[in-house]
């Protein structure tokens, strides 16, 4: 399910990055770091009032060696294109500037919800004239100190209040399939082959070659939205306006997808950039299919396929649940299997396991492989149940969660996948002490 997107916009030195860090720290659940996965500092997930949303720090994508006006233009473009809510941040210590007024004119044209926040406010020493800021036309400002946390709760309350509902954000009822990968792995060629193979394209949604371009295709009476993202490049290469914009579009496209196709070039070795791109989808907990493209360029295919699969599994250990398909977009070899794999994932996402059946599998798993001693005791699982379907989530009631060894958790996950068919779908297993 797509999350809402919040963009923090403002001129330099108003505290955008400080506010970004403050909001991200407000998230109550901390996700464990995973080897091979990197998180870009301009993009993060937060939670407030049980609502998860994505935060974009436009301060993290300022242009180098560019005039100030172009920097503001890039920030506004990103906000207009991607955000569901825009936080317009001002600096109380410096007051309202001409640059602030220029940004306000740009943001006013977006017709999107604007939350006006005035940062660097110290209520003990500062005078405040709210009418000066209300003259911008965005209503009453919220006074905050991002550094000290003053007023950030009120700000988050207003953000959630202004954000569209889950239903409105996810109003496209087609299965949204995004195709991600580094440049030149054949993403656009694959989309063209899929559309050409089916010969049933419904429409093309206009975009540019640097944007994520949507195409709608119908297969077996099921409509899919295929999203071809611009190639994600190494961060060190992302200097120009268009490249930074493209990178951010790829990140937000992953957020809006139901299934992600991670494309690799099977004819060359896997790179760190490939694994980092896969990590973007992994962190968003998206169902993933790994597409090894350009298989037509590989010689001795029968001999090489096992080697290549082992290489992929070694580099993408955190995507052990993902299915691997070897295809050629150029000669259309095996590309129809992609839709079959997507439908398998759709089925898995809708699957709800009966508690009685689930516990039978759980008991058999413990007989096959009893839990080892760990942290001074042995894990005993009393019973479990599925509590959520879309991201399959299982709660297991145990004697002590501290006795769970990571390898045994992985064993249980593999058994659940094997018995119930959750290939390609991320899964969550929660251990709770029985009371």
Curated annotation (Swiss-Prot):
Spell out the Gene3D superfamilies in the cross-references: 3.30.300.20, P-loop containing nucleotide triphosphate hydrolases
Q: Drop me one GO molecular function for this one.
A: GTP binding
List ligand-binding residues for GTP 1: 10-17, 57-61, 119-122
Domain KH-like positions:
351-435
Q: Does the keyword GTP-binding apply?
A: yes
**Matching SUPFAM superfamilies:** P-loop containing nucleoside triphosphate hydrolases
In this UniProt entry, which cysteines form S-S bonds?
none
CDD domains annotated for this entry? Answer: EngA1, EngA2
Q: Which family does it belong to?
A: Belongs to the TRAFAC class TrmE-Era-EngA-EngB-Septin-like GTPase superfamily. EngA (Der) GTPase family.
Name this polypeptide is given: GTPase Der
Q: Which organism is this protein's natural source?
A: Mesoplasma florum (strain ATCC 33453 / NBRC 100688 / NCTC 11704 / L1) (Acholeplasma florum)
């Amino acid at each position: 399910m797509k999350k809402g997107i919040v963009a923090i916009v403002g001129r330099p030195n108003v505290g955008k990055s400080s506010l970004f860090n403050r909001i991200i720290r407000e998230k109550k659940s901390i996700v464990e770091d995973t080897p091979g996965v990197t998180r870009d500092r301009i993009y993060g997930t937060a939670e407030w009032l049980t609502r998860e949303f994505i935060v974009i720090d436009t301060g993290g994508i300022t242009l180098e060696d560019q005039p100030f006006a172009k920097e503001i233009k890039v920030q506004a473009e990103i906000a207009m294109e991607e955000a569901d809510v825009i936080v317009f941040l001002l600096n109380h210590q410096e007051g309202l500037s001409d640059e602030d007024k220029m940004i306000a004119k740009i943001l006013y044209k977006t017709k999107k919800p604007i939350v006006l926040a005035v940062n660097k406010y110290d209520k003990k020493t500062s005078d405040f004239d709210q009418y000066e800021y209300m003259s911008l036309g965005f209503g009453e400002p919220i006074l905050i100190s991002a550094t000290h946390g003053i007023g950030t709760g009120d700000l988050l309350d207003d953000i959630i209040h202004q954000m569209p509902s889950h239903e409105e954000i996810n109003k496209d009822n087609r299965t949204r399939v995004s195709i991600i990968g580094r440049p030149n792995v054949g993403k656009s060629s694959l989309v063209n082959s899929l559309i050409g193979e089916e010969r049933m394209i419904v429409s093309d949604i206009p975009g540019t070659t640097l944007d994520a371009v949507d195409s709608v295709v119908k297969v077996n009476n099921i409509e899919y939205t295929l999203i071809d993202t611009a190639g994600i490049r190494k961060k060190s290469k992302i200097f120009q306006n268009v490249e930074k914009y493209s990178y951010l579009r790829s990140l937000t496209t992953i957020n809006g997808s139901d299934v992600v196709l991670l494309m690799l070039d099977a004819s060359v070795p896997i790179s760190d950039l490939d694994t980092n791109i896969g990590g973007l989808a992994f962190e968003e907990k998206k169902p993933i299919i790994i597409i090894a493209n350009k298989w037509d360029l590989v010689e001795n295919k029968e001999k090489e396929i096992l080697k290549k699969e082992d290489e992929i599994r070694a580099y993408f250990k955190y995507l052990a649940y993902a299915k691997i398909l070897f295809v050629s977009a150029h000669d259309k070899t095996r590309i129809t299997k992609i839709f079959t794999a997507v439908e398998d994932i759709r089925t898995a996402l809708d699957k709800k396991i009966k508690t009685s059946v689930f516990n039978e599998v759980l008991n058999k798993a413990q007989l096959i492989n009893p839990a080892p001693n760990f942290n001074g005791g042995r894990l005993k699982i009393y019973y479990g149940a599925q509590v959520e379907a879309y991201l399959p989530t299982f709660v297991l009631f145990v004697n002590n969660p501290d006795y769970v060894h990571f390898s045994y958790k992985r064993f249980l996950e593999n058994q659940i996948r094997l018995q119930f068919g959750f290939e390609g779908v991320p899964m969550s297993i929660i251990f709770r002490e029985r009371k």
